[in-house]
């Protein structure tokens, strides 16, 4: 069970505010383990964003068995972010995802070059704000 912590003062950010928050946030540097998986990364980023005044959502993508975050920016609309780290830990793992039901889950790294192919198709989304 994932329990999200929301803050009443959290608001929708601009895209630049979101990127600045993600640069400072270190959730992506945590190691991926059998007991700390994508849903935990998404919860941690959600709670950190909310604590820092940024409204965040938690997303479960059926068909991909994957969890990540969603932000409603005031200038660029809906932005999906995946901060899931690597086994052993690594830096610069933040990714902006392309998310659409019936389409492959893909994306790009935000702070280094490279694209992401998740190897699955999104059947539907479960979104919790």
Question: Where on the chain are the PLM-derived regions?
Answer:
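A structural boundary/capping signal
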Residues: 1-129
């Amino acid at each position: 069970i994932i329990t999200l912590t929301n803050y009443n003062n959290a608001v929708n950010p601009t895209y630049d505010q979101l990127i600045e928050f993600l640069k400072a946030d270190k959730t992506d540097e945590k190691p991926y383990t059998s007991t700390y998986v994508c849903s935990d990364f998404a919860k941690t980023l959600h709670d950190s964003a909310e604590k820092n005044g940024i409204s965040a959502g938690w997303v479960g993508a059926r068909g991909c068995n994957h969890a990540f975050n969603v932000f409603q920016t005031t200038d660029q609309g809906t932005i999906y972010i995946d901060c899931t780290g690597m086994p052993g830990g690594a830096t610069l793992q933040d990714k902006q995802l392309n998310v659409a039901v019936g389409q492959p889950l893909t994306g790009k790294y935000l702070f280094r070059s490279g694209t992401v192919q998740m190897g699955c198709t999104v059947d539907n989304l479960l979104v919790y704000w």
